[in-house]
């Protein structure tokens, strides 16, 4: 079983432009792919899946009407998530990481918290969403936390374990496979920089709304193929 797959679901807006649709429709189609992955992937092949739902730049630099649509869509999607039978029959725990408590409207915060609380005792699989998240901001906050701890306790040993415990992702294992859709073969704003230090990367030109479960399976097959080569 793969312990942890992270997905940067890029290309929703490009898909919308190509198909003559609105950005909102692009995000909606992307959510359909997320649903498909959730329904099919937690079958004993993957333990943890993390989706990057919104960066800080997404929330700060995009037009306000688009940001408000994002908030509305997140609220709708998370409510729908809790109705999936797979979430409950497969005991999938939902986590939401990032600065959503600082940035999101209260109603959306309430919906997110309900999803977290409703699944907190599930332990077979973990479904994580990064919302209001940038990797460089995560690391800056970790450094600030460690600095404050060191001031309070000069004898504190600063090591890799302490850094990990200071991250949003402190309860998650390192990322084994990072998938990025949308034809952008690079990382962005330090995405999960600590947890992807030894990850395999899988880049595809396919925009996320066209990233079917078949394409997801291809990424997993390639990951295992690379692993076999490395083991020789």
Language-model features: locations:
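Flexible, compositionally biased loop and terminal segments
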Residues: 1-232
């Amino acid at each position: 079983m793969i312990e942890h797959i992270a997905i940067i679901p890029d290309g929703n807006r490009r898909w919308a432009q190509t198909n003559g649709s609105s950005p909102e429709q692009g995000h909606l189609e992307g959510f359909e792919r997320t649903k498909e992955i959730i329904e099919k992937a937690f079958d004993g092949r993957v333990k943890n899946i993390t989706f990057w739902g919104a960066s800080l730049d997404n929330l700060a630099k995009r037009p306000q009407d688009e940001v408000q649509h994002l908030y509305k869509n997140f609220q709708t999607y998370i409510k729908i998530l809790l109705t999936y039978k797979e979430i409950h029959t497969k005991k999938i725990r939902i986590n939401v990481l990032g600065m959503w408590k600082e940035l999101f409207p209260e109603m959306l915060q309430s919906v997110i918290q309900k999803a977290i609380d409703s699944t907190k005792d599930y332990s077979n699989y973990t479904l994580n969403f990064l919302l209001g998240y940038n990797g460089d901001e995560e690391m800056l906050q970790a450094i600030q936390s460690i600095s404050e701890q060191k001031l309070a306790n000069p004898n504190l040993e600063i090591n890799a374990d302490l850094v990990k415990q200071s991250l949003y992702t402190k309860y998650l294992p390192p990322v084994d496979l990072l998938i990025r859709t949308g034809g952008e073969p690079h990382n962005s704003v330090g995405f999960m920089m600590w947890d992807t230090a030894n990850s395999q990367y899988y880049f595809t030109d396919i925009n996320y709304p066209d990233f079917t479960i078949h394409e997801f399976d291809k990424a997993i097959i390639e990951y295992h193929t690379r692993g076999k080569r490395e083991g020789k």
